[in-house]
Structure formats: C-alpha cells, structure tokens
Amino acid sequence: MNSSYNHHIVKSYDDELNRLVTEIIRMGEIAVAQLEAALDVVERRDDKAADRIVMNDEAIDALEQSISHEVMRLALRGPMARDLREILAGLRIPADIERIGDYAANVAKRSIALNTMPPLPQTASLRALGQLSAQAVRNSLLSYSNKDEQIATNVRENDARLDAQYTALFRELLTYMMEDTRNITPCIHLLFMAKNLERIGDHATNIAENVLFLLNGEQMLPPREKCDNTSNVNLDCILD
C-alpha cells in the first residue's frame, strides 16, 4: 500500500474524529443553553418556558444516541493509541452531557411546582450556584475543544468551590424551614434543584478528567477535593 494512500486514510480518519468532537461540543452547548434557560425560568416563574425546556431534553438524548453510533463506527476501524483515547473520550463525555441535560430539565420541572407557592429569597442563591455550574460546564467543553490541559485542571480544582456553595445553600434552606414550617415544601423543591446543580458540576469535572485522560493517557490523578458537607448536617430539628 503506497504512502499517499496511507496519508489519505489517516487524514480521512482525523477529519472524522474532528467532526465527532464538533458534534459533541454542539451537544454540550445545547445542554448549557438548557441549564441557563432553566435558571432563567426559576427566576421568572415561567411555566410555559419550563415545559419547553423539559420537552427539549429529548433533542440531547437523540444526539447522544447518534454520537454513540458514530463512535462505535470509528472504533471498528482499529484506532491507534492516541486515537483510541479520543474514541473513549467520545463515548464518556456525551454520557456526562446527557446527564447535565437531564438535571437541567429536572430544575425546570421542579420550577413549575415551585410556581404554585409564594416566591422565596433563596432563589437568588440557587441562581448563583447554577451560574457556577454552567461556567464549569462551559470551561470543561472549552478544554475538550482546545485540548487544553490547564483549563481541564482548573475545572477539576474549582469543583470544591461549587461544593462549598452548595453546602452553604443547603444550610440556608434548612434554617429557613426551621423558621416557618410553611417554608418546608418550597424549600424541599429548592434543595432538590440545588442538588441537581451540584451534580451538574460533578459531571463537568468528569468531562475535564476525560480531557486529562485524552491528553495524558492512564495517569493517576490526585484525589478530587470534595467540600460537600451536607451529610454532616443535623436534621433532627426539622424531623422532630
């Protein structure tokens, strides 16, 4: 087989890998748009817009299926070591993006229930947490698109800040429930929404870790710092 033919095959494969990355980034951008729209409808108390976000989640699911088929097709062509890491990242990252889309839809869905009750001041804290999560996702996608190790490392390290903000909101909501039992139901919805946002941050970190794997191979990463201390909070005062 002559060298020009080999070059053509390699270039064709590289082009297909590049198209795969572009499609995964597009999927990620849709998921971030869904998340930012969900945060917006919580603030505006817009049921119709929330319904649209929930329905739009199907588009992300369909994209994941399409990307998964494309990844498997490329995998069957016997990629080399670096390309194999690209293939593995191409399987893992869309799965994280799909979960991000699911959590964004969950936030929108709970906002509809929340809109039947008086507004709570803690929605501002929820939005701040959501903005941190959205930025983490955007940065993880940027690290993937640019193959940027430093951005990926920063996303991973900043997850502790997001956890700390989630814990602070968790405590704030518990205090608000203790002050008036009428706050319990809306605060529980906000607690679930906050947890969804915290999990989105975790999935953004997963994407960043897959970028580090893609760039460096099987390299042992230091343990991820976790600052989610909600499991240590005493709930007896609410349950009594």
Curated annotation (Swiss-Prot):
<comment type="function">
    <text>Plays a role in the regulation of phosphate uptake.</text>
</comment>
<dbReference type="GO" id="GO:0045936">
    <property type="term" value="P:negative regulation of phosphate metabolic process"/>
</dbReference>
<keyword id="KW-0592">Phosphate transport</keyword>
<dbReference type="Pfam" id="PF01895">
    <property type="entry name" value="PhoU"/>
</dbReference>
<keyword id="KW-0813">Transport</keyword>
<dbReference type="GO" id="GO:0030643">
    <property type="term" value="P:intracellular phosphate ion homeostasis"/>
</dbReference>
<dbReference type="GO" id="GO:0006817">
    <property type="term" value="P:phosphate ion transport"/>
</dbReference>
<dbReference type="GO" id="GO:0005737">
    <property type="term" value="C:cytoplasm"/>
</dbReference>
<comment type="similarity">
    <text>Belongs to the PhoU family.</text>
</comment>
<dbReference type="GO" id="GO:2000186">
    <property type="term" value="P:negative regulation of phosphate transmembrane transport"/>
</dbReference>
<keyword id="KW-0963">Cytoplasm</keyword>
<dbReference type="InterPro" id="IPR026022">
    <property type="entry name" value="PhoU_dom"/>
</dbReference>
<protein>
    <recommendedName>
        <fullName>Phosphate-specific transport system accessory protein PhoU homolog</fullName>
    </recommendedName>
</protein>
<comment type="subunit">
    <text>Homodimer.</text>
</comment>
<dbReference type="InterPro" id="IPR028366">
    <property type="entry name" value="P_transport_PhoU"/>
</dbReference>
<dbReference type="GO" id="GO:0042803">
    <property type="term" value="F:protein homodimerization activity"/>
</dbReference>
<dbReference type="InterPro" id="IPR038078">
    <property type="entry name" value="PhoU-like_sf"/>
</dbReference>
